[in-house]
Structures are given as C-alpha cells and as structure tokens.
Amino acid sequence: MFKDLEKARPGTRRDLPAVLAALPWNAQGLLPAIAQQHDSGEVLMMAWMNREALEETLRTGRVCYYSRSRRSLWRKGESSGQVQRLVELRLDCDGDTLLLRVDQTGPACHTGRRSCFYNRLDGDGLEVIAAPEIDPETLYHR
C-alpha cells in the first residue's frame, strides 16, 4: 500500500481498516511513535504503539501508547495529569513510524522536563540543556 501512495496525489484516501492491516508492525506488534507539539514543532518524546493503542488514540483523541516494561496500554497523563491531545496523526513514507502532532499539557517527560530530548550530544560528549519544569516527585504524587 505505501509504495503505491508514493505517487498518489494530495487528497487520495485509504480506509482505516486497510491502512491498519498494511502497517508493518515489528515482531512485538509495535510501531515507534514520535510525539511533536503541533504548534511549535518541538519533538517531545518517542514511545511505542500497538494496534489497540493506535485505535484508541484515533477513537478518543487522547494519546495512548503501549508500555513495553509494563506490557500494557499507557494512557499518557493517566498518573501525572500531563495528557496529550491528538491534533493530527501522520505516517512516514514506509508506514513504519507514526508522528503524533499533539497538544501537550505540561511536561511530556517523566523527569518533569517539557521534552525527553534534553541531552545534547556532540563531539565532546553530552550536555544537559533543559531543567525540569516540575519535580518528578510532585508530578507523580510520590
């Protein structure tokens, strides 16, 4: 399906069941999902989605991921209150990566930072470039 879409004109559509069936889920039934703030373009985080998480996200408009460590659905913000509302969902050209354009409430990272990408790496090493907005102990009511 995705090879055919390379030559498709804008406005070309495919039904959701056909798209979901054509997605190249990995051996664990997952696809990488990148969350991006819809209005600024800031990359917030990368997580995983299985089919159930993707369908729930599309159905409800509230982002749901799949937690590999817990082996269960992870509804973003369920314990922290820092929810992601789906604005738009895109697929890359191969259909093997999801881009979720979201409206993020508060920090996206479990460390209390706005983005999980707060470590800059260059030829000299790693530098932390962002401070937490919220103490993680407060964020998760520990």
Swiss-Prot record:
Pfam families: PRA-CH. Zn(2+) binds at C93, C109, C116. Keywords: Amino-acid biosynthesis, Cytoplasm, Histidine biosynthesis, Hydrolase, Magnesium, Metal-binding, Zinc. The keyword Zinc-finger does not apply. PANTHER family: HISTIDINE BIOSYNTHESIS BIFUNCTIONAL PROTEIN, HISTIDINE BIOSYNTHESIS BIFUNCTIONAL PROTEIN HIS7. Belongs to the PRA-CH family. This is Phosphoribosyl-AMP cyclohydrolase. It comes from Alkalilimnicola ehrlichii (strain ATCC BAA-1101 / DSM 17681 / MLHE-1).
